[in-house]
């Protein structure tokens, strides 16, 4: 898969009726060839525990990791919950429609959005209810507080009753005429629904949809709609009340979601989301350079060019290091201290479909071909 092209063709224009029309691929200079990596020292063991298959994934998948289970889906409508310790199915169900966004879950109820703009909730391998949406969605629904929240491509946030599917409220914010066909940002912080709307994090009342606060991560600039695109992209990183995010090709930053105030922002030209811990935040750039920032103040801690010119996945910061994959099917482990390469393993010939997750004592990755791998780092 040509990832660079697919990311540009993933831009869609939202018409007034909420219909998205795909744009043609944008041309640009050819990407320099990455330097061959040879003689990687094994400074941290990475052991494969199990492999499984979910089927091809060509939508912005989000894997929901809860305790010892992971919930995931493929493009053709299969939704599955796996035991993260063994890779075995807890349950698996084939829907009658292809999937465009998911999986959202609170550990019990799951939610996905189909390409026919239908929100579908499931529990224990059975469909609970379905509701039509006014527009496409590329962001996994948020299941929280007995509600299901959806962020649609026309930048509307819609809340549904989790038990019945009854629509509770809708909130729409004006934005740029383009939207990414990429998972956005939506999470619950205490009694606030936090949503990425254009280049801002917005805090909404989950009961009414009223906006309580907004904090800018990036401001649209440029001479055309593509250059002005600064949507916030998944994955985000949360520690306590502070949520850190990336604005597409513009910046990274952190916001105190309890106070509704920005903590810091820094320029950062990347396309994928971020990951961090109590002290640092890791954010790959579009050119394959990986950067780490001080989480409290945004100061640059380190960057590494070891993976330069590779097309990288979103990262996962672990106690053992930073996991990040490239479009050639390699999974790398980088040092938390300085970004040095600690190990790499071959997963598949394809890129990852989403960022790695942790559940059941295993790190779980999913490739575009649908290969699911669980591994440990003893």
Residue ranges, per PLM feature:
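Bacterial N-terminal signal peptides that target proteins for export
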Residues: 2-16
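C-terminal motif of bacterial Sec signal peptides marking the signal peptidase cleavage site
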Residues: 22-25
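WD40 beta-propeller blade core
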Residues: 80, 120-121, 158, 202, ...
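Short loop/turn segments that connect beta-strands within beta-propeller blades
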Residues: 83-86, 123-126, 161-164, 206-209, ...
